[in-house]
Amino acid sequence: MSDKSFLNWPFFEQRHRDLAAALEAWCVNHLPVDHSDVDAACRGLVAALGAGGWLQHSGGVLDVRSLCLIRETLARHDGLADFAFAMQGLGMGAVSLFGSPQQREWLDKTRAGSAIAAFALTEPLSGSDVAATSTIAERVQGG
């Protein structure tokens, strides 16, 4: 068991301590999983995280401290569980904040773990390096 004394630091509230304890208990009962088929393991983890209510911690209602506690706890028990959680958030984060009504229809499914979010990007000079993307505006005739 890892040292949890940091949860008593003044910037953690009781809700953070409750979250950490509840997730720790969930992890003990559900993790680690068999990684022999990584694709199946990821699908199963997303479904289990959704069924456990852990994917509800997303979008505008999620504070950074809660996000850190969730990711640290999942990663300590099973790195693939942290990956599955992070990818659901990365894939739907922009949709939860800025998505169209049609795009937002996917939020309940991804939070329930019945749909898997995706995040894809390619840029000529950065490939899949999100931090290296850039936007250039060029004035064109007629627009």
PLM feature spans:
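Short loop/turn motifs at secondary-structure junctions and domain boundaries
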Residues: 2-3, 38, 126-129
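N-terminal glycine-rich anion-binding loops that anchor highly charged ligand groups
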Residues: 17-19, 26, 49-50
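Glycine-rich, Trp-frequent "lid" loop and neighboring beta-strands that shape
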Residues: 101-143
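Intrinsic disorder at enzyme termini
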Residues: 1-21
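Internal helix-loop-helix
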Residues: 50-114
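Electropositive phosphate-/nucleotide-binding environments in soluble metabolic enzymes
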Residues: 13, 17, 39, 43, ...
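Gly/Pro-rich turn-and-neighbor structural signature
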Residues: 35-51
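N-terminal capping segment at the start of a domain
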Residues: 24-33
